[in-house]
Amino acid sequence: MSKLFLASYFSDVASLFPDFAGNDCAGKRVVFIPTASLLEKVTFYVGADKKALQKLGMVVEDLEITNMSNEEIEKSIAYADYVFVSGGNTFFLLQELRRKGVDNMIIEHINNGKLYIGSSAGSAILAKDIGYIKYMDSLDAAPDLNGNFSALSVVDFCIVPHLTNFPFKKIAEKTVKEFSGTLNIRAISNNQVIIVDGEKVETLTAKGKK
């Protein structure tokens, strides 16, 4: 049974996480994968999300996968209570997850009933295909994909993050307009999160956030 917390910007909806996790997140071990942000010029969100996890009492372990052995990665994910995949370039993230076999490790983690947290690219990556995110992220960051954008296929919808948020508002709106007729699009702003708990799928909004 899938248990997913899929945000546009985790730190803005972190207040909703304890209830979703059964008010049992303090002391939990979180594997934090920041790989999507490696080629980005702006990365403040990585530190903000990590700080939000720690503020909730979780123990955060950085797992930057590009230079780690498969054995190290597999061991860390196997021992983790939660896996967190941060934002950045979704195409680069898919390329590196696929190259290291971490896509399958994450799927196994989810299939074992363990909780997954995504933020922006980390949420979008769970779709069947991420080609729809082409206006938001540069394809040039992931030449090894060779046009194959098949992703983790954990959910049957496609998340468009940052719907009302600068500087992505117009790009997000363009993406929704172009693909909503052919894909199951779920667009969220930074103050919203899509939660999946088995068959239940719901969009929640954090109070006091925009």
Q: Predicted segments — roles?
A:
Residues 36-38, 88-91, 121-122, 164:
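Short glycine-rich anion-binding loops that position phosphate/pyrophosphate groups of nucleotides
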Residues 57, 80, 113, 155-156, ...:
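Short, well-ordered alpha-helix to beta-strand connector turns
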Residues 95-96, 103-165:
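Class I SAM-dependent methyltransferase SAM-binding "motif I" and its flanking Rossmann-like core
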Residues 30, 83, 120, 159, ...:
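A residue-level signal for conserved active-site and pocket-lining positions in enzyme catalytic cores
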Residues 1-82, 86:
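N-terminal beta1-alpha1 cap of cysteine-dependent amidohydrolase-like domains
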Residues 91, 123-126, 193-195:
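Short, active-site-adjacent cap segments at secondary-structure transitions
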Residues 8-9, 192-193, 197-210:
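Patatin-like phospholipase A catalytic core
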Residues 153-197:
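Conserved anion/nucleotide-ligand pocket segment
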